[in-house]
Structure formats: structure tokens, C-alpha cells
């Protein structure tokens, strides 16, 4: 019996010694401080209430992100609003040639601050951010990145 | 519902193309009509009045409409979209019932120059949010509600005149739509006015022409809930025909479109609206 107690205690001590603190890292958010390289102000289109600041920059690991500021608003009650990087303020789709003037970033699900991780890094040719309703094919707003 | 043409401007719903008149039903008299309507357009006027070419929006609707005289001066009216099927060409179709319009109409003047006042609340019985899945992009969907989610009240003053024995009539009306809001968004009130002339051919076929115009009152909020018709303005032009199969039964055909004649189009899909129906009318309770 004493041997069993000793063995159980040894196992408990062994597990206690191996216990480590688990830290979850959300890779969709910047690690450390986000530094903006370019920024712009969203211009509303089609009465969607789109407004706010967008920034293109990197975190402390040099990973690139697109940031929507805490003042970002748009009408999300209409359905999905998708974020694109574009070579101009106009949404120019050319799927037959791989949409060279667009890069889909992803759907935006809330107003206020949001980050989109850009992997691979966005090409320098993308000068604008466009908010786009893909089902109706109408723009909700755009911002020039300067 | 808010427009008698396209219900929600962006999400648009073809509702009953029924006109307003100064006539009321005598006690026990009634009229019912079942109709189907169809609409498709890729021409959208945004809130600023700029025309955009979008994906094609489509709507089909089945509706019921009825009038019944409950007193010498009182008529009850109901218009109920039984089914609305909405889609873009890029999305799957979504369906639902529409908003029920219940109306009480009071005859202020009767005789050769009837004048009537009606109050018509529109109840939010339709689907307030109805998301349609994009056919090609899995994360894309768009809200195509079949009701606007609000309780609004139309108040209408209408006058008519029959040129009997010449088989023709004319009606004019003015309406005020008191709107409330949905989900924190306050909708602006609207005014609407219109006229209709009708003429009977060989005792069997009534034909009519209609002109209407709607204006939104007040300044827009931010953001404007445009999918629920806030800010919708237009001038409408329509034509109709009703052919009597029997003394009580008629077939109806109607057409409507929009233009910029009185109020320019804003927050509206514009295009041809076709409807067909069958109506039954009786002179006393049977």
C-alpha cells in the first residue's frame, strides 16, 4: 500500500513539475505595436454611412496588416461587405486574367477597429481600399492610401 | 411596405398596384383580387439619384387584395402579399410573406363627387431580415427582406368623379406615410400624390392610366437604412386593364414603370413591373 501511495505521489509531483502556462497568440492580430506606413480616410458611396480611417502597416514581427480604425462605420445590415485592395478607387474586376487590379482581403463583420493580416505582403501597386457588396455589385466606400 | 410600387427601394418589393379613389363600398358589397407580379432590373438609382448598373435584382410576388363595405360610409380594405421571392442574379432566391396593409376608409362625401379619407397601418408581418447566399462566394450573402420591419401608417385623402353616362372616371389623391423605424434606425416620413383616369370600352373592358409621385421628408440619418426604403423617391406611370368575364368575375393586367417627371428617382430599382390577376366583385353579402 505504501508503495502505491509513493508511486501516486511521484506521478503528481512529476506532472506538477511539467505543468507550463499556456499562452494563446491570435495570429490574426498584430504582435506588439502596429506601425502604419500608409493611411487614408474612407469616402462613403451610395448612402451606406461608410466612414473612418484605414491604415496599412506592420507589427513588431514585420507582418503586414490592414487596420480599420475605431471610428470605422458602414451599413452592415445589408449583408456581407467585403474589403479589397485596389489599384484605383474603382472596382475593376477581370477574373479571366486573375483580377490584376484587385486583391480580396476578406469580409468585414463589425464596425470599429478591425485588423486583416496580409500574407503575402500586399504589392505596392495597391493604392486604395474598397468596400464592396459582391452580390449587388455596388461599392460602399473607398479610401486612398497615402 | 411603404411604396405602392416597389416596396423597399433597394430590396424592393412589388406590392399591389392598387389605386386610391373617393368611392367606398355599400354595406355588404365586396371585391377581392388575387394577383401575381414580376419584376427584374439591374438599374438602381442610389440615394443621391445617381444611376448604377448592378447585378440584376428579381422579384416575383403573389398577393391578395380585398374591399368590403361594413357601413354606409365605412369600407375595410386589406392588401396582403402572400409570397415574395427575392434574388439577385448572383444569389440564391429567398422567400417570405410581405407586410399586411389593413385600411379603414371613410366616405366624407358621396354622390357624383365622392371624397374619402382612409387610414392604413402596415404591419411588419414580413421577414425583416432574409439573407440570400451568393452563388459563387461562400462568405457572401445579402439581406433581401420581404418586410421592412416597421409599423407605418398611410393616411390618404382621395376624390373621384364619374362622367356617367359617358363611361369614364377620374380620381386624385394625396397620402402621408408616417414611418417609425427598425432596429434603431428612424425612417423618414413620405408624401405621395397621384391621379388616375379610366375609360370603359364596349361595356366589357376597363382601361386606365395612372401617374403618381413620392417624396421623402426630412434630412437623412447616418447611415440611411436604404434597404428598407428610407429615402425612396420617384414618379410612377402605370396602365391597367380589367376585362369582365362575367358580371362578377374579371381578369386584370397592369403595367408600371418609373420616371423622373415630378420627383426624380432615388433609392429605387427601376424597370418594368407586370402584374396579372383575377377579381371577383359582389353587390351584397352572398
Regions found by a protein language model. Give the residues of each.
Chain B
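Outer-membrane beta-barrel biogenesis signature
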Residues: 16-47, 53-54, 155, 283-286
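Transmembrane beta-barrel strands of outer-membrane/channel proteins
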Residues: 32-38, 78-82, 117-123, 172-176, ...
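Residues on the lipid-exposed face of transmembrane beta-strands in outer-membrane beta-barrel proteins
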Residues: 34-36, 64-68, 78, 102-106, ...
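Sequence/structural signature of outer-membrane beta-barrel proteins
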Residues: 39-43, 84-89, 122-128, 141-142, ...
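Outer membrane beta-barrel transmembrane domains
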Residues: 45, 192, 196-286
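Residues that define the transmembrane beta-barrel architecture of outer-membrane proteins
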Residues: 58-62, 94-100, 147-153, 187-193, ...
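Repeated loop/turn-to-beta-strand initiation elements of outer-membrane beta-barrel proteins
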Residues: 73-78, 112-115, 165-170, 204-207, ...
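Outer-membrane pore/translocation modules
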Residues: 93-186
